[in-house]
Amino acid sequence: MSPVAPPPAPPRLSLQTAAIAPDTTALRSLDWDRSRFDIEFGLRNGTTYNAFLIRGQRTALIDTSHAKFRESWLPQLQSLIDPRAIDHLVVSHTEPDHSGLVADLLELNPDLEVVGSKVAINYLEHQVHRPFRSRAVKSGDSLDLGCADGGTSDHRLEFVSAPNLHWPDTIFSYDHGSGVLYSCDAFGLHYCSDEVFDSDPGAIAPDFRF
């Protein structure tokens, strides 16, 4: 009788939060063992899904995470903020690693306003299967979050339509208060690391083509 092979080890998934700008926290979902992305990309160093929490007088969350992080990502978000205190969810595009937990977030905060391109809002209506408040934006539109109590940065998100970089519903968000451009996937690559910033270009060079 042939020996029974042991079950495969569960994938390594971890979370990291880091302050990256005034009143701004990155929520990083680290998918260490992912070996393929969008079928055609073979990955050597996993990948990372990023969301960003911006607190002014009003609060915005840019993107969520992949559904595989549901059990850990939502509690991590709740450790940072009561989801009912989030006013706006900006969806950069509806690829599953950006929008995989939108429905879960709407369960926690049904009054949340979802902000995205007209195409993204249409896609989400078919993904979450429930009514939700929404705002369709295009290049030149903006969302004023104001200045956090005790803060010095007046956060205003200006949107840039970027269809087919690399999905048809993509938008960029530029925060005039912090000077941060949230560029969706336009300048990203698949590389999983504990380092929040790519301070060593040599480390990521072999993966840059992905």
Residue ranges and their predicted role:
Residues 62-64, 85-94, 114-117, 161-162, ...:
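Active-site neighborhood of phospho(di)ester-bond hydrolases with catalytic His/Asp-centered motifs
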Residues 57, 68-115:
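Active-site metal-binding motif and surrounding structural segment of the metallo-beta-lactamase
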Residues 3, 37-42, 65-68, 90-93, ...:
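Short, flexible loop segments at the rims of nucleotide/cofactor-binding pockets, characterized by
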Residues 17-79, 172-175, 180-183:
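Conserved beta-strand hairpin/beta-sheet module of binuclear metal-dependent hydrolase folds
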Residues 3, 8, 12, 19-22, 151-210, ...:
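Metallo-beta-lactamase
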Residues 1-11, 15-22, 177-178, 196-210:
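Accessory terminal helices/loops
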Residues 104, 126-129, 192-196:
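Short acidic, glycine/serine/threonine-rich loops at helix termini
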